[in-house]
Amino acid sequence: MATQICTPTFSAGSAKGLCGTSGSFSRISSIHSMGSCRAPSLVGTVGSVSSFRTGFSGPGSCLPGSYLSSGCHSSGFAGSGGWFCEGAFNGNEKATMQILNDRLANYLEKVRQLEQENTQLECRIREWYECQIPYICPDYQSYFKTAEELQQKILLTKSENARLILQIDNAKLAADDFRTKYETELSLRQLVEADINGLRRILDELTLCKADLEAQVESLKEELLCLKRNHEEEVNALRSQLGDRLNVEVDAAPPVDLNKILDDMRCQYETLVENNRRDVEAWFNTQTEELNQQVVSSSEQLQCCQTEIIELRRTVNSLEIELQAQQSMRNSLESTLAETEARYSSQLGQMQCLITNVESQLAEIRCDLERQNHEYQVLLDVKARLESEIATYRRLLDGEDCKLPAHPCSTECKPAVRVPYIPSTTCTPAGPCTPAGPCTPAPQVSTQIRTITEEIRDGRVISSREHVVPRAM
């Protein structure tokens, strides 16, 4: 009696059998060879323990689903596992049923757990999308307008301050001009007073000279009178002496009139004094006029020089004030430019940091989305495989029983169970075995990956895009 040995090997997400099966599920068709019959076997994957319930349709009937033959043993399904079915049919149906029921319960529990995890992940993704409110750049237009108004006010205030400073400087210059004029007039007054004092001293000296001359004239007059008296006395004395002695008549020259001579001398002296006085007065007048002319010319020149100096000082002060105003305006403009550059550079740095942060957040979100999409794809793949496996088990449980002959070595076997078939799965016997029928393809299970992209702004959905990707199992 020849038997077919089929040893499927499990891996994460796929199953391969040594009989040539590959894909997510492995099916072995019913084989009738040398009077022995073996029912098809279906094995699940994805790290979960798969089990299903089988039943007997009666004595001599073929077991639907999967059964354990003699010498068949199972290994753990933590990530990988396999069935090694060798030998004949095992008669311990109750133990087999118990094991299969336990495996089915574990499988259903694992399915429910995965569904709960899928629901939790969907809730977390939804909450994360709700929490991730798109960053709205604040509107700085009002602040820019306020800043421009403040800058205009600052410029107007600076210009007003410059105008007030210019007026103050002009007032200071006018005060300096008046002070200079006052000092000039004061110096002129002092000079005139000094000249007057000098002229008064000269007048006093001339008065003293006049008094001296008058005193001299008086003394000369007194001396002349004394001389006249003495002369008369001498003449009288001589006459008296001559009268007593001799009367001598002498024919002499006429006598000299002394009064006339004195009058002539007096006239000469008076004319001389008058001439001297006129000369001195003329000289004094000429000297005074020359001095006054020199003083006037000097004062005029001094006044001209002082006015020129004042004008030059005023011009210099106005130019200095204008220079200071221009320098202050330049400094204010430079400070304003520096402040503007610093403000815009800081705003640019903040925006650059914000852009960098947003880009990093977008990169993180993209990585999270890719990771979650990958996990979601893996979960969808697992879910689809589990659903297909559940559907397969359900069809196996709800299908018709396969009637087997009473004798295990009968030459015919009519399987009553149709198992889904993966197109890439082939049945290759390990020994001489004649299959009961050709391998018919089972219906394919197709899945769709639906990606919904929503753009949310201020808590409102602006746009929504849906992308459906068909995926065949």
Swiss-Prot record:
Misc remark: There are two types of hair/microfibrillar keratin, I (acidic) and II (neutral to basic).
Coiled coil regions in record: none
Region named Coil 1A: 94-128
Keywords: Coiled coil, Intermediate filament, Keratin
Subunit organization: Heterotetramer of two type I and two type II keratins.
Region entry Linker 12, spans: 241-256
Alphabetical list of Gene3D superfamilies matching this protein: 1.20.5.170, Single helix bin, Vasodilator-stimulated phosphoprotein
Gene name for this UniProt entry: Krt36
Record's GO cellular component terms: intermediate filament cytoskeleton; keratin filament
Name under which the protein is recorded: Keratin, type I cuticular Ha6
